[in-house]
Amino acid sequence: MISKIRNFLTRKVGSKVLTKWVSEEYLLNNREEREKNRISENRGHEVYYFHQLKDPYSYLACQTLSELLDIYNINLKILVVGEPNIIHEPDMFYEYCFDDASSIASNYGLNTLPSKLPSSSAIKLGERILLNEENLGHDLLIRITEKVWSNEIKELEELSKHTQEVENHLEENNLKRKTLGHYQGGVFHYEGENYWGVDRLSYLEDRLEALSLKKNDNTINKGPKMIRRPSPFEHEEELILEFFPSLNSPYTYISFERVKQIESDYPVRVITKPVLPMLMRNMEIPSYKGKYILTDTAREARRLGIKIGPILSPLGKPAERAYSLFPWVNSHGKGLDYMYELMKSSFADGVDIGEKKYLKNLIKSLDLNWKE
């Protein structure tokens, strides 16, 4: 009994924290406070950019630095960082990042990636060159990044001849990135907020423009691209879209409406294959990573007009109970709708989806028979 009460209280306290993180009021109050502190400390508008030489998203992001400086009255501080401390399935991770970055580059008007990831030797030489620069500029960063990704070992060796060991510098930069609340490369940071990759750059631009930092009427405008279906759209064979939702994933939650829209707009059959949340598979997720994911999801939700908060995490027994009904619900053709309703309840209504009464009502709302 005591254990149940403790778990209940822990979830309630956690719910308040998660709900606060996704609140627009919390975001705006933080911005106001940060701006007051910046002015009182007589600091300029400093944007950090964290660059990882092995990272495909960094390869794209660094191509925007020149424009960023041309358009906005900011001080840009470039820090070269290493890989995240924890990468689950690193080979699969980098393969996905490479394929994804390659596929989106042209949509953002950026140079596409070379044919493969750079070698570890090229990366180490590139890090050594860049980390020996006291005030690293974007021109050198881009030049060395190109040489690293082209695996120009001889040229990199020549450029690194008179440089010193840089391991301590790399660790210092990694720590700075962690202190500012992130874990990846290709990340921009301005006064308490992180913007990972070119598809989040528009949020940084909006913030800088709101502070009247534009020097001209130009814009990078590398925001998310919303691709609309051609009309009419026909396909001779049925298309299959496999969807792997996780009940504790904020990104899963905001993807549902678009997945359902794809199913509606195209001759597509969605096959729903739920996966267990990472934390229920004993995977380690640092708190700062969890916070970034939630706050990033919240701004995407606001852009898309999707309600988010209050939040009550379904981790543990609630998720187990909800998942246990999925095979039966899915056998009746309601799997996608079932998962969607569960996630709306967790991420938009703060409801405990493990309660028997809740699950019974949900099953009935899907026109299914609870007694089966």
Describe the role of every protein-language-model region:
Residues 1-34, 39:
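N-terminal leader/targeting and pre-domain segments
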Residues 5, 16-19, 59-69, 141-232, ...:
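C-terminal cap of thioredoxin/glutaredoxin-like
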Residues 27-32, 223-225, 273, 288-290:
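Short acidic/polar alpha-helix capping motifs at helix-coil junctions
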Residues 38-41, 67-68:
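Short secondary-structure boundary/capping segments within folded domains
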Residues 41-57, 75-76, 235-250:
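Short active-site neighborhood of thiol/selenol oxidoreductases, capturing the structured segment around
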Residues 53, 59-148, 254-346:
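Structural alpha/beta surface segment adjacent to cysteine/selenocysteine redox centers
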Residues 56, 83-84, 193-195, 201-202, ...:
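Short, solvent-exposed loop/turn segments at secondary-structure junctions
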